[in-house]
Curated annotation (Swiss-Prot):
Residues 58-61 are annotated as: G3. An essential GTPase that binds both GDP and GTP, with rapid nucleotide exchange. Plays a role in 16S rRNA processing and 30S ribosomal subunit biogenesis and possibly also in cell cycle regulation and energy metabolism. It comes from Streptococcus equi subsp. equi (strain 4047). InterPro entries: G_ERA_dom (IPR030388), GTP-bd (IPR006073), GTPase_Era-like (IPR005662), KH_dom-like_a/b (IPR015946), KH_dom_type_2 (IPR004044), KH_sf_prok-type (IPR009019), P-loop_NTPase (IPR027417), Small_GTP-bd (IPR005225). Gene3D superfamilies: 3.30.300.20, P-loop containing nucleotide triphosphate hydrolases. One of its GO terms (molecular function) is GTPase activity. Its main location: cytoplasm. This is GTPase Era. It is found in: Cytoplasm; Cell membrane. The gene is era. One of its GO terms (biological process) is ribosomal small subunit assembly. PANTHER family: GTPASE ERA, GTPASE ERA, MITOCHONDRIAL.
């Protein structure tokens, strides 16, 4: 008997949702950064064994939006509640419950689907603090289970995956066993470039960046995959930061991104990077759609 199901990973920004998904999948399919609001699109991670398939949906961190991009991200996250049988509500062990958590809890109560509370980053707290956190959240909602984990170190992750397997119902294999995500390679390439920008820049710059893959094709002569990407920013000053002194920052972004892209594609890559200014793109629906943030996602 084959069993399958869809599982949403929900929570505030920067609680470790993408780290968890990448750990379960055994490879990077979601961007990771210590900066909030790193994930902007819903990303599917397809975990398949001989007898089960769990389709995880990693969602953007739920926050109070300040831009049209923020609205897109939050609606994209909440829309997954209509698509799944189970929700993993992830919270950090090293932060007390806040207004953002309470807002999510109210939406989860209204959705009326089983919710597993996942308390992440347990490696950062004393067991007594963890027990307090468990008691506090338990008083807010009737969770199906409460599972403390460390997504970074892998503690208890297998236990959580096994719990999900045990609760699966008989169903179809929705995706082939060798498919690990629903996003095309172009999307993953753009995310890998954006991840390097997130790691290497500060303040407002990371949030003002979109990455568009202009072309991606194999060069018959060199047998390399030739990829051209454009990094979009909102201001000239941000363009200067990303290019860096004598182009040093842009070279660094390209070099680090190329390594990850080559690992993913299993091919040699020639990566060409450009930077363009598109003023206030985060508040323009046409620009959002052009850069891959499309309302069709929800």
């Amino acid at each position: 008997m084959f069993k399958s199901g869809f599982v949403a990973i929900l929570g505030r920004p920067n609680v470790g949702k993408s780290t968890f998904l990448n750990h379960v999948m055994g490879q990077k399919i979601a961007v990771m950064s210590d900066k909030a609001q790193t994930t902007r699109n819903k990303i599917m991670g397809i975990y398949t064994t001989e007898t089960e398939q769990i389709v995880f949906i990693d969602t953007p961190g739920i926050h109070k939006p300040k831009t049209a991009l923020g609205d897109f991200m939050v609606e994209s996250a909440y829309s997954t509640l209509r698509e799944v049988e189970t929700v993993l509500f992830m919270v950090p062990a090293d932060e007390k419950r806040g207004k953002g958590d309470d807002m999510i809890i109210e939406r989860l109560k209204a959705a009326r689907i089983p919710v597993i509370l996942v308390i992440n980053k347990i490696d950062k707290v004393h067991p007594d603090q963890l027990l307090e956190q468990i008691d506090d959240f338990r008083s807010q909602m009737d969770f199906k289970e409460i599972v403390p984990i460390s997504a970074l170190q892998g503690n208890n992750v297998e236990t959580l995956v096994q719990l999900l397997k045990d609760n699966l119902e008989e169903g179809f294999q929705y995706f082939p066993e060798d498919q690990i995500t629903d996003h095309p390679e172009r999307f993953l390439v753009s995310e890998m470039v954006r991840e390097k920008v997130l790691h290497l820049t500060q303040q407002e710059v990371p949030h003002s960046v979109a990455v568009v893959v202009d072309s991606m094709k194999r060069d018959e002569v060199t047998d390399k995959v030739h990829i051209r990407v454009t990094i979009m920013v909102e201001r000239d000053s941000q363009k200067g930061i990303i290019i860096g002194k004598q182009g040093a920052m842009l070279k660094k972004i390209g070099k680090l991104a190329r390594r990850d892209i080559e690992l993913m594609l299993g091919d040699k890559v020639y990566l060409e990077t450009w930077v363009k200014v598109k003023k206030n793109w985060r508040d323009k629906k046409l620009d959002l759609a052009d850069f891959g943030y499309n309302q069709k996602e929800y």
